[in-house]
Regions:
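Beta-strand-rich domains and repeat architectures in extracellular enzymes and scaffolds
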Residues: 2-16, 21-62
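Sequence signature of WD/YWTD-type beta-propeller architectures
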Residues: 2-15, 65-66, 70-74, 80-81, ...
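Beta-rich, blade/repeat-based domains predominating
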Residues: 26-27, 33-50, 78-97, 101-102, ...
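Conserved blade-register residue in beta-propeller folds
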Residues: 65, 105, 162, 204-206
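Short loop/turn segments that connect beta-strands within beta-propeller blades
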Residues: 66-71, 107-111, 164-168
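Short C-terminal beta-strands that terminate individual repeats in beta-propeller domains
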Residues: 74-76, 115, 173
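Short consensus segments that form the blades of beta-propeller domains
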Residues: 149-153
Length: 206
């Protein structure tokens, strides 16, 4: 957190959160110094096999790794200012890259596959966050970029998209957001209802 006067807390909006974490546990400060003026560290992703946490230090264009007992170390630099991170059903890393305006997947051999970089022939704005559903579909948010004037956007809206598991079909699910940001599925059933948070905070939508 950038403001030491703020008290961190977890706001539980649904009982299903208890399936993931205990909200009664105290919040522990692990590290700081990330993000800079452009925003905080984001995109946390727990890598179960290695027992470590990956996260995006967007402003510094790098991916960091937190290992319990060892602290924070550099995982990758540069990252095209990647933000949201997740894994697909095969365990491959999927990332939203700001600078390259695309969503990518890292293969087992380290090569990069482009999941999406355009819609109907127009470049994406600035992919922000990404999740994978139990059927393998990839969902991501694509808000407009504050670094470009509206007339310079290829897409004249901020969107929420779904890509099929074979990377063959990209569908626009919503285009009426101002700035769609975080994305998650509510763990109530296998139907997987996607929820998107909007910034500035106008609420959560599904």
């Amino acid at each position: 957190m950038s403001d030491n006067n703020l008290t961190p807390r977890i706001e539980q909006l649904a009982p299903e959160l208890e399936k993931i974490i205990s909200t009664s546990e105290p919040i522990e400060h692990l590290a700081d110094g990330f993000g800079g003026a452009q925003g905080p560290a984001e995109g946390p992703l727990w890598w179960k096999e290695g027992g470590y946490l990956l996260f995006s230090d967007i402003h510094n264009n790098r991916r960091m790794k937190y290992q319990p007992g060892s602290g924070v170390s550099l995982s990758l630099e540069p990252t095209n200012r990647a933000n949201g991170l997740t894994r697909d059903l095969q365990g491959r890393l999927v990332a939203c890259e700001h600078d390259s305006r695309r969503v990518t997947r890292q293969e087992a051999d380290g090569s990069i596959t482009v999941v999406a970089n355009s819609f109907q022939g127009r470049r994406l704005n600035r992919p922000n966050d990404v999740v994978v559903r139990s059927d393998g579909c990839i969902y991501f948010t694509d808000p407009w970029s504050s670094q470009a004037a509206p007339e310079q956007w290829d897409l004249q809206y901020s969107g929420v998209y779904r890509m099929t598991p074979d990377l063959g079909t990209l569908s626009l699910l919503a285009d009426d957001f101002v700035l769609p940001n975080g994305l998650a599925f509510l763990l109530i059933s296998d139907c997987g209802i996607p929820y998107a948070a909007e910034r500035p905070c106008h609420g959560n939508y599904r």
